[in-house]
A protein has these predicted regions:
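Catalytic cores and adjacent flexible loops of soluble metabolic enzymes
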Residues: 1-119, 123-371
């Protein structure tokens, strides 16, 4: 057994697990059933409950997102588990800019609904889009977790990210999230980045969010933990791995073996939560989940598309597949398989992305590059 190292906490990204697997997430009646089992697992300091595309889906179900958020956060709050949401900085929960007074009000409302932390990101890492939200969240009594959207390009170096972190921390952010939404951040770079931030700002909490799609995530988790990260975002079966996130069981086992202080997992509760999540998938959500999202692919290293977009993109590709082949048949040209289309799409992204200045491929810029 290695020497005891620092404590590492875990956050279950229950919202992102769904968004990265398909188009939708459970109804509120299902969310309130799963929450006590997540609590019972006993290994999560935090749970991602809302934000991102989550609340738009409530509206599609005819649910009131305000009531849904209150209902889902309540069991975690009672158990002393922090809840966190995802917000798009200047764009709040939308795809386009939201007036400042509305954003200011949003944090007050979300805090009243039981959300503790807001993870504020800008797809361009533009601090001017993040800093006002840090101030509004602090005013509302929330913890603003300022985000670095991680990608791999000639521009995105340790120095680049560290200087952004300095500005966000100076603006009042007590926490920094490394949002490796496509899982293409190189483990060595991520470790150096965590060390650089921690050396300068030892009291700032660092949370790592890395998708498992291209296969680097376990090495990245190891590197960030060895260099001072505090919290790791994880998933659980039946929706871990693939384009989603590593499973809590594997991450906990790896870190425990290395001497990190990690919580134990109540496996009875894990299996119950796993079965219940599968039940949600079987009832109707599985219709909107592409089976290929369970696969990891090193091809993703080339295109850098985020886990959260692979679900909707595969559904979109399937939707246009037959139409494209119909046109090709009309021209007496050979038909294309889904794999052919995917490779063409990856090539196109590789061509378009540098021309746009290497924007991190996350909402809304992933959509621009994809479309």
């Amino acid at each position: 057994m290695a020497m005891m190292k620092k404590e590492i906490k875990f956050s279950l990204v229950y919202r992102d697990m769904w968004q990265s697997s398909g188009k939708y997430q459970p109804r509120v009646d299902q969310l309130v059933r799963i929450a006590p089992l997540i609590v019972e697992m006993g290994c999560f300091a935090r749970v991602e409950t809302n934000g991102g595309a989550f609340e738009q889906v409530n509206l599609l179900y005819g649910e009131n997102p305000n009531k849904a958020v209150r209902a889902f956060t309540a069991p975690f709050r009672e158990a002393g588990i922090q809840t966190h949401m995802l917000d798009r900085g200047l764009n709040a929960l939308r795809m386009y800019p939201v007036p400042a007074d509305v954003r200011r009000l949003m944090y007050k409302v979300k805090h009243a609904q039981g959300v503790d932390i807001t993870r504020i990101f800008c797809g361009l890492n533009e601090t001017r889009n993040i800093i006002p939200s840090i101030k509004y969240a602090l005013e509302a009594g929330m913890i603003p977790q300022a985000t670095l959207c991680i990608t791999y390009s000639p521009v995105h170096t340790v120095e680049y990210y560290a200087s952004i972190a300095d500005r966000l921390i100076e603006a009042g952010a007590p926490e920094i999230c490394l949002k490796d939404m496509a899982g293409i951040g190189r483990p060595g770079m991520l470790g150096q980045l965590v060390r650089t931030i921690k050396e300068k700002h030892p009291d700032v909490l660092i949370q790592y969010h890395g998708h498992s799609g291209p296969g680097l995530s376990m090495a990245s988790i190891l590197e960030v933990c060895e260099n001072g990260a505090d919290i790791i975002d994880v998933a659980m079966e039946p929706m871990s791995w693939g384009k989603v996130h590593p499973d809590i069981i594997s991450v906990q086992a790896m870190l425990k073996d290395l001497g990190f202080q990690v919580p134990d997992i109540n496996m009875k509760a894990y299996m119950k939560a796993r079965a219940m999540t599968q039940e949600f998938i079987d009832e109707f959500l599985g219709y909107f989940m592409d089976p290929t999202n369970k696969h990891m692919s090193s091809l993703l290293l080339k295109c850098g598309l985020p886990g959260g977009m692979m679900g909707s993109m595969m559904a979109d590709l399937k939707g246009v597949h037959s139409g494209i082949n119909m046109i090709l048949r009309g021209k007496n040209e050979p038909e294309l398989s889904l794999d052919d289309l995917l490779v063409m799409l990856f090539d196109e992204v590789e061509y378009v992305w540098p021309k746009l200045g290497y924007p991190p491929l996350v909402t809304p810029f992933s959509q621009y590059v994809k479309n």
